[in-house]
Regions:
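Short alpha-helix immediately C-terminal to the canonical SAM-binding loop
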Residues: 84-85
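Mobile active-site "lid"/loop adjacent to the S-adenosyl-L-methionine
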Residues: 126-155
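Conserved class I S-adenosyl-L-methionine
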Residues: 48-55
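A short acidic, Gly/Pro-enriched loop at the edge of an enzyme's catalytic core
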Residues: 113-121
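Class I SAM-dependent transferase core
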Residues: 3-45
Length: 155
């Protein structure tokens, strides 16, 4: 495998126990144990073929689910351009995972563009804090990942 270009604010990680390599930001917007636990928590049924990952970030959850279920088609939806571009780079890095796709869009726009029955499984590792609560990180990407600045879980 050719080593990808890594920016100064990034690192290349290998996810233990998998064949997944992932470029991540080193400024605190990297995935956490919560994402690994969520991926392990998901139960698959034989009829599950299409999945959506809402707020897919770097793509880690989509790759973990695909690693666990080779037949699953997964589309990650990510609003933040920086993370969408990172997920696309990670997709090139993990080209062995056919059937993983990413779209740069607001998850609140999905109902207007995609039929709800298009997906058998929908997953998300949403922001932890409601807007206006807690201390807001200075970096915009980190703030949006941790706080409901672009919509609520209910939306």
């Amino acid at each position: 495998m050719k080593t990808p270009a890594i920016e100064l604010d990034e690192r290349l990680d290998t996810i233990p126990g998998t064949t997944i390599s992932l470029i991540q930001k080193i400024d605190g917007t990297a995935f956490s144990i919560d994402t690994l636990l969520l991926a392990d928590f998901v139960s698959f049924t034989p009829e599950m073929m299409n999945s959506a990952d809402l707020g897919s970030g770097s793509g880690i959850l989509a790759f973990l689910l695909k690693y666990r279920n080779k037949n699953l088609q997964i589309t990650g939806f990510e609003l933040q351009n920086e993370f969408f571009e990172l997920s696309e780079r990670n997709l090139k890095l993990n080209s062995q995972y056919e059937g993983v796709y990413f779209e740069n869009m607001d998850v609140r726009d999905i109902p207007a563009r995609i039929l709800p029955e298009s997906y058998d499984l929908v997953v998300s590792n949403p922001p932890y804090f409601p807007a206006g609560s807690g201390r807001l990180p200075e970096k915009t990407t980190r703030a949006q990942a941790r706080h409901e600045l672009n919509g609520t879980v209910k939306e």
